[in-house]
């Protein structure tokens, strides 16, 4: 039974982690994912959610204040 618990934990962690280069769509636009509360300056650098995680958005790099 312990083996099943270990196997489940391993599979859970394997699927929970993301590949090394996550958020490809945001990075292709020259952006970076920031928490949604951050303000992108100028507003035109706010690309929206794109492929960022939940409650995060994509802003052009260096614009998150």
From Swiss-Prot:
It comes from the Eukaryota. Gene3D superfamilies: Anthopleurin-A (2.20.20.10). One of its GO terms (cellular component) is extracellular region. Expressed by the venom gland. Pfam families: Myotoxins. Disulfide bonds join 26-58, 33-52, 40-59. It is found in: Secreted. GO terms for molecular function: potassium channel regulator activity; toxin activity. Residues 1-22 form the signal peptide. GO terms for biological process: envenomation resulting in occlusion of the pore of voltage-gated potassium channel in another organism. Keywords: Antimicrobial, Disulfide bond, Ion channel impairing toxin, Myotoxin, Neurotoxin, Potassium channel impairing toxin, Secreted, Signal, Toxin, Voltage-gated potassium channel impairing toxin. Monomer. Belongs to the crotamine-myotoxin family. Cationic peptide that possesses multiple functions. It acts as a cell-penetrating peptide (CPP), and as a potent voltage-gated potassium channel (Kv) inhibitor. It exhibits antimicrobial activities, hind limb paralysis, and severe muscle necrosis by a non-enzymatic mechanism. This is Crotamine CRO1. It comes from Crotalus durissus terrificus (South American rattlesnake). The lineage of its organism: Eukaryota, Metazoa, Chordata, Craniata, Vertebrata.
